[in-house]
Amino acid sequence: MESSVKYAQEFVQRYYSSLDTNRNGIAEFYRENSLILWNGKPMQVTEFTSMIVNLPYSKTKVEDFDSQQVMGNDMNIIIVVSGTIRFDGKKPHVFSYVSFYCIYLLVLRSSTNFL
């Protein structure tokens, strides 16, 4: 259980850091056949990364995350993340931050590595 929290914390830190500073690297967090839902719209990884790299610069603040180990043949982890994001070009004021809520399923890539 403790390792699932460690992996979740590492994922959240790396993913949102990449989202803010290295969007071209976001694809490394997904398998080639991953299906992504963005505001209810299903997309493949290539479509998703193309969309992400064209968004304005952002500053993300993760407010909270929770993780639970999912039992099965492999140890997988479900992560729920909430926070705020502000896109460049918006004047800083109380309404310039947009809340987000995301759910991820980390799937074991090797016997000891999720990321």
From Swiss-Prot:
Gene3D superfamilies: 3.10.450.50. One of its GO terms (biological process) is poly(A)+ mRNA export from nucleus. Pfam families: NTF2. It is found in: Nucleus. Its main location: nucleus. One of its GO terms (cellular component) is nuclear pore central transport channel. Residues 7-115 form the NTF2 domain. Keywords: mRNA transport, Nucleus, Protein transport, Transport. It comes from the Eukaryota. PROSITE patterns: NTF2_DOMAIN (PS50177). Stimulator of protein export for NES-containing proteins. Also plays a role in mRNA nuclear export. This is NTF2-related export protein 1.
